[in-house]
């Protein structure tokens, strides 16, 4: 399924709800902390098991923990220490949407993930260089984040 080019919210939602798992993986991205942004030169990455995150929104705001499970079907992640009690009284992980967390530590065990980070960093550097060239080569015209000031 190709991604919808329509501007109709109905069709965008339908595409989101019916997206295949390999495309949902890309939709599970969360922003990186300012320290990681500076270190890796990228703004966001898809969340993976083993990443350490801080919850930024919701009832569990401020909690910090490792991601123990990523559910692509429900588009939710489960964080260590973020639990609720079900009707039987057993603790259960509380599902959190990845847009509501910030990654503070990356799990870099996977070589392919390191390559993805490097590729995204190079792409960003290239974009910044092109923006500087388009602005007449003046470094003041481009802010630190690559936005025109």
From Swiss-Prot:
Keywords: Ribonucleoprotein, Ribosomal protein, RNA-binding, rRNA-binding
GO cellular component, one term: large ribosomal subunit
Pfam families named among the record's database cross-references: KOW, Ribosomal_L26
Xref: CDD domains: KOW_RPL26
Similarity remark: Belongs to the universal ribosomal protein uL24 family.
PANTHER family the UniProt entry points to: 60S RIBOSOMAL PROTEIN L26 FAMILY MEMBER
Protein's job: One of two assembly initiator proteins, it binds directly to the 5'-end of the 23S rRNA, where it nucleates assembly of the 50S subunit. Located at the polypeptide exit tunnel on the outside of the subunit.
Protein name: Large ribosomal subunit protein uL24
């Amino acid at each position: 399924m190709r991604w919808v080019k329509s501007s109709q919210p109905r069709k965008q939602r339908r595409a989101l709800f019916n997206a295949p798992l390999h495309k949902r993986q890309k939709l599970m991205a969360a922003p990186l902390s300012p320290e990681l942004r500076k270190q890796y030169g990228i703004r966001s990455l898809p969340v993976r098991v083993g990443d350490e995150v801080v919850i930024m929104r919701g009832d569990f705001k401020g909690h910090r923990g490792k991601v123990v499970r990523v559910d692509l079907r429900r588009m939710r992640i489960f964080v260590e220490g973020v639990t609720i009690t079900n009707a039987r009284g057993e603790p259960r992980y509380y599902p959190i949407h990845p847009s509501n967390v910030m990654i503070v530590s990356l799990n870099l065990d996977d070589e392919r993930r390191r390559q993805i980070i490097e590729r995204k960093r190079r792409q960003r550097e290239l974009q910044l260089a092109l923006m500087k060239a388009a602005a007449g080569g003046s470094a003041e015209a481009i802010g630190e984040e690559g936005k025109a000031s």
